[in-house]
Amino acid sequence: MEKHGPPEHAAYPIPQADYQGSQGPYPGPQGPYPGPQGPYAGPQGPYPGPQGPYAGPQGPYPGPQPGYPVPPGSYAGGDPSGFPVQHQPAYNHPGGPGGTPWMQAPPPPLDCPPGLEYLTQIDQILVHQQIELLEVLTGFETNNKYEIKNSLGQRVYFAVEDTDCCTRNCCGASRPFTLRILDNMGREVMTLERPLRCSSCCFPCCLQEIEIQAPPGVPVGYVIQTWHPCLPKFTLQNEKRQDVLKVVGPCVVCSCCSDIDFELKSLDEESVVGKISKQWSGFVREAFTDADNFGIQFPLDLDVKMKAVMLGACFLIDFMFFERTGNEEQRSGVW
């Protein structure tokens, strides 16, 4: 009798005689899937959030979002990147550009006049005279203004000349003046007084000098011109008018595409301990303005009062040799 159905294949095993096929229909999973054990109740009670309401830092910062780590206690607001602010905004008094950062005030050491603590941690000062547009266009002499910076470009002081209009335009560069030096809060920390003196080497009895007061009204030193037929020389004195250091300049003070150095020397003039440099500012600035740039270098451990006296020497040198008023040409020599 012929067998019907699919042909047998050698690869498939022959079912046993009592093979009943599949054991009934596939029962599927053992009963319906129970799912989670009861409905999900969520967290046990409402999430309490941080312990107590977070007030956030002082200022417009709204505080962290839920789940965001709490900033450290010293956090005082930040920039968009979230980093703490390293420098607090400082008061920009009139006349000073607002974009220049101020140097942070260090702790004042003992026996340091108030306001001079900035000078205890630096060995270099940059003095930049500001360009006055009215003076450039009309030749009308205005009060000089200076930015005083450290080697990092941070502003340490701001200096403003306080002289009446008649004195500025009649006496020119030989004029007496009061220079007020302000800190980042606009407080006057130093006052420089230059009396009216003769500017010719033919009268050695009435030479130039400037008094440095810190705080205002309390002299801390003097810069006295020393007579010499060829060289510009100055003596730096302390508050008791005792000689401490000397400043010696070149024979011909000509700023032609190079810096001019006035060396800071010991009293015997044997060793050089620093210098005051008139820096070349470029042809256009040198030719059409009297806005000069200076660099002052001194030992880091120099007495802070003598550092202030060196700053006064820089201003006296500027007025004596590099100040131009009205239609006068900038001086190219010592006398």
UniProtKB/Swiss-Prot annotation:
Keywords: Calcium, Cell membrane, Cytoplasm, DNA-binding, Hydrolase, Lipid transport, Lipoprotein, Membrane, Nuclease, Nucleus, Palmitate, Phosphoprotein, Repeat, SH3-binding, Transmembrane, Transmembrane helix, Transport. The chain crosses the membrane at residues 306-322. It is an enzyme of class 3 (hydrolase). Pfam families: Scramblase (PF03803). A motif (SH3-binding 1) lies at residues 64-72. Magnesium. Can also use zinc with lower efficiency. A lipid is attached at residues 201-202, 205-206 (S-palmitoyl cysteine). Sequence repeats lie at residues 23-29, 30-36, 37-43, 44-50, 51-57, 58-64, 65-71. Its EC number is 3.1.-.-. A motif (Nuclear localization signal) lies at residues 274-283. GO terms for cellular component: collagen-containing extracellular matrix; cytoplasm; cytosol; Golgi apparatus; membrane raft; nucleolus; nucleus; perinuclear region of cytoplasm. Residues 323-335 are extracellular. Residues 1-305 are cytoplasmic. GO terms for molecular function: calcium ion binding; CD4 receptor binding; DNA binding; DNA-binding transcription activator activity, RNA polymerase II-specific; enzyme binding; epidermal growth factor receptor binding; lead ion binding; magnesium ion binding. One of its GO terms (biological process) is defense response to virus. This is Phospholipid scramblase 1.
